[in-house]
C-alpha cells in the first residue's frame, strides 16, 4: 500500500479560502458555523491511531483520506456528511471500527466539499463519487480490495464493484439501496430537501432523529450540531438530492464479487425492503436481517453488525476467552468503558448506545472481571491510562 503525505486543507462549498472559519485545533469548516466540542475529552487507543493524508482526483480536487489498522484494505466510501477528525472523537464510532481495524487496513475519506476535502467544481453526481473512490484506491495502489458501502456509500460501492470486477474481492453493503427514488415518496423527498435548504437547524435535528432514533437525546443533539458545523445548508440539501437521484439497480446483476447485504428491519432512514430487493438483484448475495431502528451501524446492536462482517471476511470475531490476557475487551465493552470514563451512569450509557440498562450493567460487570477491578473509578482510570498509552 502506498501512502503519501500532503498539506492539510478544507473548505466550504463556495467560499474562498480566506473566508473559511476555523476552530481550535486548526480544523476548517464551511459556512461560518461553530463546531461543537465533544461532550468530554476522549482517551485514545493506540491500536486505533489513524493517519490522515491527502490525494488528488484527476480533476485536481484534493481529497482527505484516513487509514487505520493492519492487513488487506477495506475501503469505506463516504456514507453521508463527515469529518475525518471530528467523527473519530466519538468513542462509539471509534470502537465500532476497532475489530475491523484489527484484521484490515480501514480506509475512509471525506467527500468533496465536506470535512477536510476540497469542494468539487460543480454539482456532484454518482460519477463524481466513483471518480473520488477510484482516486483514493489508485493513490494507495490497491489492486485488490474489500468494499464496505453503508447508506449513501452503498450504491457507490455497488457501481464500483460492477465496473471493476477484478479489483473488488468482497463487498459488504449495510443499510443500502439501489434506487434512491424508492427511499420515500416524491412529496416526502421534495419536502425534506426544501426543509434542509431553508431551515438547516430544524433539518439537521430531523436527520439526527431519523439516523439515530435509539440514541440518547444528548447524542442526537450533538450529531445534529456536527452536521451543521461541517456542512452548509446548501451542501446538505444537494447531497440529499443526490442521494435520492442515484440509481444503480441496472448494475446489480453485473456484481460478481461475493456480497453480504446487512439491513436493520426497522431502519428509519432506508427501508428494509430496499436492502432485501438489492440483495435479490445481486447473483449469490447473502442477506442478513438485523434487529433495530438506527441507521448508523455503531448505534444499537453494533456488535451484531461487526460480527457478521468479520465472519463474511473470513475472520474470527474478537471475543475474549479465558486464555486471553487481562484488559482484552470486545468492541462493545470498549464503548462502555469509554462512556464510564466520561462519567455516565448505566442508564445514560444504555441511552447513548441504544441498549437496555441491564445490558449496560452486564457489560460493566464483565469489564470489571476482565480488568480485574471492582469499581467504576478503576475502569475510568484504566481507560484514561492504558487505553491512551499501550
Task: Please describe what each predicted stretch is.
Residues 158, 162, 168-198:
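Flexible "cap/lid" loop of the alpha/beta hydrolase fold
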Residues 201-246, 251-252:
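Conserved alpha/beta-hydrolase catalytic His-Asp/Glu region
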Residues 54-118:
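Conserved HGGG/HGGXW glycine-rich cap/lid loop of the alpha/beta-hydrolase fold
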Residues 265-270, 295-296:
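Acidic catalytic loop of the alpha/beta-hydrolase fold
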Residues 255, 261-263:
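Short beta-strand/loop motif that positions the catalytic acidic residue
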Residues 320-365, 369-370, 378-390:
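Helix-turn-helix DNA-binding segment
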Amino acid at each position: 500500500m502506498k501512502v503519501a503525505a500532503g498539506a492539510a486543507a478544507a473548505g466550504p462549498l463556495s467560499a474562498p479560502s480566506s473566508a473559511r472559519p476555523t476552530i481550535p485545533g486548526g480544523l476548517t469548516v464551511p459556512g461560518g458555523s461553530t463546531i461543537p466540542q465533544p461532550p468530554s475529552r476522549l482517551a485514545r487507543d493506540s491500536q486505533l491511531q489513524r493517519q490522515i493524508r491527502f490525494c488528488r482526483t484527476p480533476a485536481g480536487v484534493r481529497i482527505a483520506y484516513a487509514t487505520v489498522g493492519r492487513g488487506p484494505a477495506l475501503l469505506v466510501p463516504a456514507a453521508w456528511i463527515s469529518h475525518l477528525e471530528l467523527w473519530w472523537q466519538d468513542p462509539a464510532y471509534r470502537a465500532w471500527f476497532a475489530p475491523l481495524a484489527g484484521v484490515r487496513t480501514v480506509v475512509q475519506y471525506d467527500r468533496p466539499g465536506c470535512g477536510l476535502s476540497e469542494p468539487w467544481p460543480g454539482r456532484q453526481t454518482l460519477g463524481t463519487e466513483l471518480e473520488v473512490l477510484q482516486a483514493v484506491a489508485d493513490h494507495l495502489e490497491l489492486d485488490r480490495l474489500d468494499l464496505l458501502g453503508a447508506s449513501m456509500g452503498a450504491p457507490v460501492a455497488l457501481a464500483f464493484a460492477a465496473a471493476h470486477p477484478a479489483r473488488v474481492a468482497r463487498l459488504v453493503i449495510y443499510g443500502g439501496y439501489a434506487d434512491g427514488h424508492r427511499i420515500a415518496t416524491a412529496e416526502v423527498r421534495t419536502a425534506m430537501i426544501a426543509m434542509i435548504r431553508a431551515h438547516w437547524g430544524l433539518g439537521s435535528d430531523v436527520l439526527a432523529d431519523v439516523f439515530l432514533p435509539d440514541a440518547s437525546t444528548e447524542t442526537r443533539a450533538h450529531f445534529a450540531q456536527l452536521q451543521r458545523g461541517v456542512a452548509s445548508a446548501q451542501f446538505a440539501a444537494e447531497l440529499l438530492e443526490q442521494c435520492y437521484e442515484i440509481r444503480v439497480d441496472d448494475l446489480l446483476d453485473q456484481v460478481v464479487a461475493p456480497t453480504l447485504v446487512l439491513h436493520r428491519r426497522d431502519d428509519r432512514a432506508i427501508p428494509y425492503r430496499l436492502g432485501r430487493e438489492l440483495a435479490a438483484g445481486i447473483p449469490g448475495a447473502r442477506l442478513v436481517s438485523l434487529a433495530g431502528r438506527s441507521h448508523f451501524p455503531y448505534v444499537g446492536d453494533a456488535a451484531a453488525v461487526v460480527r457478521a462482517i468479520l465472519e463474511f471476511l473470513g475472520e474470527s470475531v474478537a471475543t475474549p476467552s479465558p486464555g486471553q490476557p487481562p484488559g482484552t475487551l470486545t468492541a462493545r465493552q470498549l464503548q462502555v468503558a469509554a462512556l464510564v470514563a466520561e462519567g455516565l451512569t448505566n442508564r445514560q450509557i444504555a441511552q447513548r448506545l441504544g441498549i437496555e440498562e441491564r445490558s449496560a450493567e452486564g457489560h460493566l460487570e464483565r469489564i470489571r472481571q476482565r480488568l480485574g477491578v471492582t469499581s467504576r473509578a478503576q475502569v475510568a482510570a484504566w481507560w484514561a491510562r492504558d487505553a491512551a498509552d499501550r
